[in-house]
């Protein structure tokens, strides 16, 4: 079964064509600068070669049409007919309280996703444009929606509620939803598969650490807690997002700096985090270079970044009454050994006995990085959200 996975953003469309159930990647790439001058499609050939194809793509339907044409292209493609594509799976960011599982997309589902647009005004409309494009270009093909938020619908009310007026929160749908759910679901299940553990009887902390970042507590197969809240700003310090901050600071800055709501939103989403503290970059590779050159603010930013992760790991271990497995994933979690080491150092009281030597040589592959005597297994699992979306698509449509 060939499943095309689409992740449509406001100015990008990422795609992957997978042969299921094996999960073999037949084609992958993405459109960038969608709707802007100089838009292009960047694809990865089977031999690993990167190819850039420039084309004016003012909107999503044209972008998806170009992706489909490249999939069938004699030089760059891997299929002879669109009929070889059996189904399309979409990343849908926000399902609110309406979706606790992945679903086949119907007009009723689209209407419910549209009702969630106020919760994700940038993401949901773009996600739906991908659905509409496929309906137009591949009429009759079945489509499945996989929600970032669905995995966290198992969080109990005392976890997802904010300590704000009860009726006001209900009126506006204000609560913690969590994000990166597809990634947390994949790496937690995959870690148990690698380690031979029963997923439904294991306490797992998953750290999805990239430019956006979140930590989740998963107990006996269900999400108990996650650091991201109603929006992807709560929790950990991120590339440009602040993470946890005293709300009183924001009202203070509104008055002190003359900021309106839009200005505060830009401040905490785009000007804070590692970039805001360091003044250098949101990219941790550039931060590490700055640290080597003696930049004190870069050092401070990195120390804050690692400390926040460590603090959440301890909190979630307490929330679950202990932890059996700690998983690192995401661009930083998979590739930056220094952050993993800082998080796991001096954690013997919690049962973590870290293997620094194994950790230092580990980048981007599945590997246990704790010592055999460690009560908590620390493991790196590269995330594969596209495989998870394709897997859900296959399961639902079969």
Curated annotation (Swiss-Prot):
Cofactor field: Mg(2+); Mn(2+)
Record field: catalytic activity: acetate + ATP = acetyl phosphate + ADP
Superkingdom assignment: Bacteria
InterPro entries: Ac/propionate_kinase (IPR004372), Aliphatic_acid_kin_short-chain (IPR000890), Aliphatic_acid_kinase_CS (IPR023865), ATPase_NBD (IPR043129)
Residues of the active site: 148
Amino acids binding Mg(2+): 7, 385
Enzyme Commission number: 2.7.2.1
Residues involved in substrate binding: 91
Keyword Iron: no
UniProt keyword list: ATP-binding, Cytoplasm, Kinase, Magnesium, Metal-binding, Nucleotide-binding, Transferase
Gene Ontology process terms (BP): acetate metabolic process; acetyl-CoA biosynthetic process
Keyword Nuclease in annotation: no
GO MF term list: acetate kinase activity; ATP binding; magnesium ion binding
Cofactor note: Mg(2+). Can also accept Mn(2+).
Residues the entry annotates as binding ATP: 14, 208-212, 283-285, 331-335
Enzyme class per UniProt: transferase
Annotated site, Transition state stabilizer, chain positions: 180, 241
Family the UniProt entry places it in: Belongs to the acetokinase family.
HAMAP family in the cross-refs: Acetate_kinase (MF_00020)
Function: Catalyzes the formation of acetyl phosphate from acetate and ATP. Can also catalyze the reverse reaction.
Assembly, per entry: Homodimer.
Protein name as it appears in the record: Acetate kinase
Gene: ackA
């Amino acid at each position: 079964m060939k499943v095309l996975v689409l992740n449509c953003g406001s100015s990008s469309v990422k795609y992957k064509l997978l042969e299921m159930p094996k999960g073999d990647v037949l084609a992958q790439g993405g459109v960038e600068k969608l709707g802007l001058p100089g838009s292009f499609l960047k694809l990865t050939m089977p031999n690993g070669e990167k190819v850039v194809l420039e084309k004016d793509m003012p909107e999503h339907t044209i972008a998806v049409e170009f992706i489909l044409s490249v999939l069938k292209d004699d030089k760059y493609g891997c299929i002879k007919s669109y009929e070889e594509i059996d189904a399309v799976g979409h990343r849908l960011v926000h399902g609110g309280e309406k979706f606790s599982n992945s679903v086949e997309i119907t007009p009723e589902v689209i209407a419910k996703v549209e009702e969630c647009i106020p919760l994700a005004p940038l993401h949901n409309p773009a996600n739906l444009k991908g659905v509409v494009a496929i309906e137009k270009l591949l009429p009759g093909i079945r489509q499945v929606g996989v929600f970032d938020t669905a995995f966290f619908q198992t969080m109990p009310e005392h976890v997802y509620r904010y300590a704000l007026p009860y009726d006001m929160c209900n009126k506006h749908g204000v609560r913690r939803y969590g994000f990166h759910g597809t990634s947390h679901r994949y790496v937690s299940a995959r870690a148990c598969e690698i380690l031979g553990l029963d997923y439904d009887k294991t306490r797992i902390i998953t750290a999805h650490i990239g430019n956006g970042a979140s930590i989740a507590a998963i107990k006996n197969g269900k999400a108990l807690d996650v650091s991201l809240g109603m929006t992807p700003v709560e929790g950990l310090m991120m590339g440009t997002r602040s993470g946890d901050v005293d709300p009183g600071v924001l009202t203070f800055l509104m008055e002190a700096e003359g900021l309106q709501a839009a200005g505060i939103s830009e401040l905490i989403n785009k000007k804070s985090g590692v970039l805001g503290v360091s003044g250098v970059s949101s990219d941790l590779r550039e931060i590490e270079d700055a640290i080597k050159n003696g930049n004190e603010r870069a050092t401070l930013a990195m120390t804050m970044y690692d400390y926040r992760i460590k603090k959440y790991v301890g909190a979630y271990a307490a929330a679950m009454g202990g932890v059996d497995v700690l998983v690192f994933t995401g661009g930083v979690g998979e590739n930056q050994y220094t952050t993993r080491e800082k998080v796991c150092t001096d954690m013997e009281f919690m049962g973590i006995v870290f293997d620094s030597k194994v950790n230092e040589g580990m980048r981007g592959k599945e590997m246990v990085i704790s010592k055999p005597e460690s009560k908590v297994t620390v493991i790196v699992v590269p995330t594969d959200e596209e495989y998870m979306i394709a897997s859900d698509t296959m399961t639902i449509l079969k």
